[in-house]
Amino acid sequence: LILVEPKGGLKPVDREFYVMQGEIYTRGPVMQQGYQEFDVEKLLAEKPEYFVLNGAVGALTNEYPMKVKVGETVRIFFGVGGPNYTSSMHVIGEIFDRVYDQGSLTAAPLTDVQTTLVPAGGATMVEFKTEVPGRLII
């Protein structure tokens, strides 16, 4: 995920998170311990063994949750490394105040969006103000 800020930068927010979604194609079965070889046949058949956030299974859930306080403004930079699947990016319990579609930070944002599509190789930026306590789960 590469960020090129517009001239003058972005307005300040209370919390920023960078999240990348990806797929892992292994020869071994799901959750097999140890070294895993890459499986090109599964890649070509679009059958990943894992979908990961920030390169890890279960990331951003229990071990490294995205924590915010009520009333904070949040910005999430979200990208999909793919190589095959798109993402219907949604934060449980939130409506995005602003969505910068396809990562365009110079175009007017979409407003009041619940879910935004991010294609493989694409990115978006979303902003919202939290209204209830809890962890942010994508």
PLM region descriptions:
Residues 1-138:
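Copper-binding active sites and cupredoxin-like electron-transfer domains
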